[in-house]
C-alpha cells in the first residue's frame, strides 16, 4: 500500500509528531505546502495543527486527494484530548472543513501539542491576548476545559507532546 504523511504545522509540535510517525512507519513525510496531486497514493495521513478552529493544511490535502485515496486525519492542539467537550469542538471544526461523506470513511485521531508564547507571531500573540482577556473573567461555570487550559498556559511555554500517543495511529495504518 502506497502511503504518504502530510503535515501542516505553524510552530513545530505537529511537525515533531509527523516526523516521529514517519520514523516509526518508514513512510515519507512532506509539508502540506508541498502537496500537489495525491491520486497516486492509496492512503494519506494528514497531521494538522489546530489554529483558530481549523486544521492547518487540511484544505490543500482534501483538494489534492484522489477519488479512491483513503484518509487518516490527526489533529494536534493545546486542548486536553481526553476531555469530551474538547473532542466535540475538534469534531465540529473538522465538519466545517471536510465534507460529511468523506469524514464518514476517515479515521480521525487527536494528539496534544504545546505552545510557546515567545515563538508566536505578532498576529497570533495579539489574537491570544484578546482571547485571554475575553475569557479570564468569565464565571467559572461558563469556562470550558479549553478556555481553562488557555488561561492556565497564557504567556508561558508548555509542551504536552507524547510520542507514545502515536502507537494507536501506527497500528491503524499497518
Model-derived features: positions:
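N-terminal beta1-alpha1-beta2 submodule of the flavodoxin-like/Rossmannoid cofactor-binding fold
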Residues: 1-67, 73, 171
Amino acid at each position: 500500500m502506497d502511503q504518504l504523511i502530510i503535515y501542516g504545522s505553524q510552530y513545530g509540535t505537529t511537525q515533531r509528531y509527523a516526523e516521529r510517525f514517519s520514523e516509526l512507519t518508514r513512510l515519507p513525510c512532506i509539508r502540506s505546502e508541498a502537496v500537489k496531486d495525491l491520486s497516486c497514493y492509496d492512503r494519506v495521513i494528514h497531521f494538522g495543527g489546530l489554529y483558530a478552529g481549523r486544521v492547518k493544511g487540511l484544505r490543500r490535502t482534501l483538494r489534492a486527494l484522489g477519488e479512491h485515496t483513503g484518509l487518516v486525519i490527526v489533529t494536534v492542539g493545546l486542548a486536553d484530548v481526553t476531555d469530551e467537550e474538547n473532542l466535540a469542538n475538534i469534531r465540529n471544526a473538522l465538519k466545517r472543513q471536510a465534507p460529511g461523506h468523506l469524514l464518514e470513511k476517515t479515521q480521525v485521531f487527536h494528539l496534544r501539542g504545546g505552545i510557546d508564547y515567545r515563538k508566536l507571531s505578532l498576529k497570533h500573540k495579539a489574537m491570544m491576548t484578546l482571547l485571554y482577556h475575553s475569557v479570564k473573567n468569565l464565571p467559572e461555570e461558563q469556562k470550558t476545559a479549553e478556555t481553562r487550559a488557555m488561561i492556565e498556559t497564557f504567556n508561558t511555554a508548555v509542551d504536552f507532546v507524547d510520542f507514545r500517543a502515536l502507537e494507536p495511529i501506527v497500528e491503524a495504518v499497518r
